């Protein structure tokens, strides 16, 4: 997308000033409508180092009540976060209905870094892109408004800004080694960025490339895009109809009525012998999956009083208590109900080498 992108004509300073006042006022008014309509908004800022992602976020949030937003800076994943699925730490950040989440970098930056380092390529890249597209589509299908901005500056402008930051000890920390590497390998990075933008540009979550060569012009582009999209989201919500969401292919299993339980019994002595043997085997497997860093999810469903709790107890007796967690799932709490249905399950996923047991 970057290779074919042409920046819009930048207006005169006086026009930018007038339009900024209008856009700021509109966003201030719309924040209450977002709350009333219970529309969750994710605003993702990606782009070149020193392109103004953080400063633009700072200007935008001045027009929103602090109670209605949060800002998350997604730096390099920690060793702990690397033990979870790639999208885990981003799913944790999604906002409640009626609120905003601003992300200073996100899944694009991490994916492009992995591509540039050679950590993912070919089939690995394709799988990553597929998972990102599903992730974004799940959210937008669930009523989330997702705004994705890429802050674009040329190589000379990036170098100029980095020099200004590096010349002062109080701002030197804002230029990372990767930012400097980006500028040295600008063409290589631009190729990766452009490919990623094309691969993840969807009608439900399109990319907006922002000409960030001028700070106020960049702020205006972001604000006007936010305002127009919020207005459309509220109109769409008023005319929305229920749709079948997130359909995945399922394995064929027998119907419950076709399962004969009459011969599924054994005497107590045989049961105790097999239980002891299988618990011993399960304990060995638990050690192996920890060494191989394999995460395991065990899910229980069934009628009340069907024996789920007792079965879980007999399984956990064989496991190292440091390597598993049992999650009883009841009706969602208000803060859970205000987010995507899967949020409360994503936040309970096991890290690699561990087991999560869901009681429903």
Give the role of each language-model region.
Residues 1-360:
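Glycine-rich phosphate-binding loop of ATP-dependent small-molecule kinases
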């Amino acid at each position: 997308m970057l290779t074919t992108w042409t920046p819009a004509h930048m207006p005169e300073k006086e026009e930018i000033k007038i339009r900024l006042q209008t856009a700021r006022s509109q966003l201030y008014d719309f924040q209450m409508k977002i709350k009333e309509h219970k529309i969750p908004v994710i605003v993702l800022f990606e782009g070149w180092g020193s392109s103004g992602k953080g400063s633009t976020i700072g200007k935008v949030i001045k027009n929103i009540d602090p109670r209605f937003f949060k800002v998350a800076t997604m730096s390099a994943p920690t060793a702990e976060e690397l033990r979870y699925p790639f999208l885990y730490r981003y799913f944790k950040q999604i906002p409640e209905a009626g609120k905003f989440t601003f992300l200073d970098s996100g899944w694009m930056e991490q994916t492009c870094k992995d591509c540039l380092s050679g950590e993912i390529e070919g089939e690995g890249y394709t799988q990553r892109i597929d998972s990102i597209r599903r992730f974004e589509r799940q959210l937008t299908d669930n009523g989330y408004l997702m705004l994705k901005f890429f802050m674009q500056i040329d190589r000379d402008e990036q170098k100029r800004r980095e020099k200004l930051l590096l010349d002062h000890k109080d701002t030197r920390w804002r230029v990372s080694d990767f930012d400097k590497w980006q500028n040295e390998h600008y063409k290589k990075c631009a190729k990766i960025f452009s490919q990623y933008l094309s691969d993840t540009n969807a009608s439900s979550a399109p990319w907006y490339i922002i000409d960030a060569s001028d700070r106020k012009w960049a702020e205006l582009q972001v604000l006007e895009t936010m305002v127009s999209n919020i207005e459309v989201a509220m109109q769409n919500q008023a005319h929305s109809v229920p749709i079948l969401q997130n359909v995945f292919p399922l394995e064929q299993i027998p119907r419950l009525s076709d399962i004969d339980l009459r011969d599924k019994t054994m005497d107590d002595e045989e049961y105790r012998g097999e239980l002891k043997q299988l618990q011993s085997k399960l304990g060995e497997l638990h050690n192996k999956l920890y060494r191989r860093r394999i995460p395991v999810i065990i899910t229980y469903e069934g009628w009340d009083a069907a024996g789920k709790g007792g079965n879980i107890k007999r399984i956990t007796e064989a496991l190292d208590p440091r390597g598993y967690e049992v999650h009883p799932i009841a009706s969602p709490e208000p803060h859970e109900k205000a987010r995507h249905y899967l949020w409360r399950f994503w936040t309970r996923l096991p890290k690699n080498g561990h087991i999560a047991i869901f009681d429903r």
